[in-house]
Amino acid sequence: MLVGILTSNQKRHKALASYVNYMGHDVFLIQEIPKTQNYEEGIIKYFIDVNEAEGSIFSGDKWTIDIENSHSIDKGLINQVPKEVDLLLECDVIVIFGSSLIKGQLFQKLSTKKVINLHMGISPEYLGAACN
């Protein structure tokens, strides 16, 4: 089965793609890369701590497999439906985990597919709140 994954580029997001591949499925991965921002020191420390925690959980072979069919796009551009999305739509199932909010034409296209939306928060308003 070809599993499409639309996600971000944090360790927990990469781990999902690695694990699906480890379980024997082909993976087509689109990762959104966030823009570098100037955060306050407290926020920087928080994300360093999250990164370290994820590193301790998602280490080992099944969590760190390189995905051959991997594409990166700038965060927030997914709704402009880049060419990679056409390939994503050919997948047997699509998993959305940690991506930008999906709307417009992309939402319409995805609504005709088998899609699993993994969202840790209680509301899209908390997007990026690292609800884990």
Language model: regions and residue ranges:
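One-carbon transfer enzymes
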Residues: 1-132
